[in-house]
A protein has these predicted regions:
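Local sequence-structure signature of Cys/Sec-based thiol-disulfide redox active-site neighborhoods
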Residues: 1-22, 26-31
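Thiol/selenol-based redox catalytic cores and closely related redox-interacting motifs
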Residues: 33-116
Length: 116
């Protein structure tokens, strides 16, 4: 299982602690140092069954600085994927990628359901 986070993010810290309390093993990836590729994002979007917009960190400084709330609707999916792949700070975090699921953001009930 892959756990993507930004170490300074308090929500990521809570999610990490939650995983560790349950002895759930994962591979840790700093989303700022090693941002997802277009290929990974494409696969995760398909696996998640959610729209690509759910992968954007809409609360982030980068998202706001780039004016993405206004720009995203006019962008193609390929353009959105390319943009997400340029900067891990644009990606919603934490992101948990399992064999048959992807969860963005830490909502404990969703993670419990996904991890069975």
């Amino acid at each position: 299982m892959l756990f993507l986070c930004y170490p300074k993010c308090s929500t990521c810290q809570k999610a990490k602690a939650w995983l560790e309390e349950r002895s759930i093993s994962y591979d840790l990836r700093d989303i700022k140092q090693n941002n997802p590729t277009v290929e990974e994002l494409t696969a995760w979007e398909r696996k998640s069954g959610r729209p690509l917009k759910k992968f954007f960190n809409t609360s982030g400084l980068q998202y706001k600085a780039l004016g993405l709330k206004e720009k995203l609707p006019a962008m193609s999916e390929a353009e959105q994927l390319a943009l997400l792949a340029t900067d891990g700070m644009l990606v919603k975090r934490p992101t948990l990628v399992g064999e048959d699921f992807v969860r963005t953001g830490f909502r404990q009930a969703e993670w419990e359901t996904a991890l069975g």
